């Protein structure tokens, strides 16, 4: 039934999109007078963005933003030919994306050492991407649809409500433009990778513009018996009747018939001991399914009443279905001859809605300029699911012999069967927030506060039980920045975050919310007249009432407090007309405090103490552009008890692009490009959740692209 629904809805939208270019052709001449939206929504150029909307929900120059913000531009994503948001963030300081190694099913991002709720810190076009991190129903946006990615570091609850303390990842979709622009790509690579993508935008009339973007991806993976398959399309329509009013309608339709692999191997077999193959498959072919169908419909409305008052409203509706069957290992048995294995199954349907209303006023009191923002937002999701669990026959990973694929309802493997529960997981949040950005000469003071009401509910229809929790919480943020005429802007800030109890404990009771606070000092430098941007930030961040996932189980356990202290350095520089550089360094000291599980003073998993990266893009002449990068991830712990370290690793990437129009005028706009990641094909462990659950890093990837820009 759902397949019929998505096909029918997609057919309607695609039919409308196909009609739009015909309408534009019907007008011989179109004089465009409407202006585009906020500057931070406009297409980026090169490797450096100059503004951000994510930090304050208003257009704000980065040089005047008293917070550490990194922006990944469209140019960077194209040059590096990224296939996931995780991959797009590989060269961003303060960000660790190695959670699942070569697996690409989810975009899981740790910021400043915090990964709890790691799929709940992503936003699309200003609204939270409403996934259910307590299930397998988690959304993923293809980076081909994105114009930019802003990483807002540090607690952000004063504007966004619930968030992890390390920050949020703000994805901005490509918008319709009133000028004609098109892109077409064909990519082929190892693991039978095949990608076809297109993107076209144009004006229909003086006040209407459209955009149609689509992509299909198909490939094998580095893992045996695994494939990835995706079909996605994103039509959008923009109406601007005058320079003060705009309405943008969007849809993002995505079908993933095969979501590839998402499992791991023990540390004994990857970090040490008899090493397993990177392609090792711990499952069973007759229980190996991951399908995801997601639809996101949204709109953005804005109106400027006069020179003082303006209003904005963003809203989205999301529907996502996920089907999963997976047999996976959970560590060695007592004599290390066989791997214990488990089974998980899920059939879930998620519906979500979010809306954000913003009233902005540009005022002046005496010599002080004020930009005041008053907002009211609401979000909710409901995920109805059938959750299956069982024990599977153990596996000898070196011979591939498991003794069969029978599933058992008991750990003694005596009773064939599956344990099934019918669940409903619900969450809603409503909040009101107020922000005042004050400017007096070169001083910039920002004060913001928010009050939230959050309700979580877990219903087990099988056990006829309900666990419900309601929390009210106030969050705040304050920052002060001084902007020197030389382009130097030092700042200091304080911010808070609330992370609600979406996660159950071992008894399926909801845990209490986690609260956080951060102190940050930093400096931003932008040479006058330059687009280059340099920044440094020092922070001290503490999260209380921490909950960690008990991998490979799906419940969470209390772990006390976590304190993160660190330094982030970033440079995005246009060194010359031909050379662009992105450089970053992260030092992150993360420790458990007041831990109740014996780990006090230890470092959590997924928190490398040092990370560094460098990417350089050089225009060599004759239409040749060469890019090269190096990424270093320092040592990290394989378990919270700190009994074993994950070794550090260094990876190299490269790209070469040839613009064919330089050699033949008839080929203007055409190009060929080669991208190689992990050039040395280094075999490494990217990260571990525990000593039983470590992820092999991605193998070497070689992809060749033929493209045409017009």
Curated annotation (Swiss-Prot):
One of its GO terms (cellular component) is cell outer membrane. Keywords: Cell outer membrane, Ion transport, Iron, Iron transport, Membrane, Receptor, Signal, TonB box, Transmembrane, Transmembrane beta strand, Transport. GO terms for molecular function: siderophore uptake transmembrane transporter activity; signaling receptor activity. A motif (TonB C-terminal box) lies at residues 693-710. It is found in: Cell outer membrane. It is a multi-pass membrane protein. Pfam families: Plug, TonB_dep_Rec_b-barrel. The chain crosses the membrane at residues 29-37, 65-73, 91-99, 106-114, 137-145, 152-160, 180-188, 194-202, 208-216, 259-267, 271-279, 293-301, 309-317, 353-361, 370-378, 427-435, 443-451, 476-484, 491-499, 517-525, 531-539, 555-563, 567-575, 579-587, 610-618, 624-632, 649-657, 671-679, 684-692, 702-710. Residues 1-26 form the signal peptide. Residues 61-174 form the TBDR plug domain. A motif (TonB box) lies at residues 28-35. Residues 181-710 form the TBDR beta-barrel domain. Its main location: membrane. Belongs to the TonB-dependent receptor family. NCBIfam families: TonB-siderophor. Ferrioxamine binding and uptake, in association with the TonB protein. This is Ferrioxamine receptor. It comes from Yersinia enterocolitica. The lineage of its organism: Bacteria, Pseudomonadati, Pseudomonadota, Gammaproteobacteria, Enterobacterales.
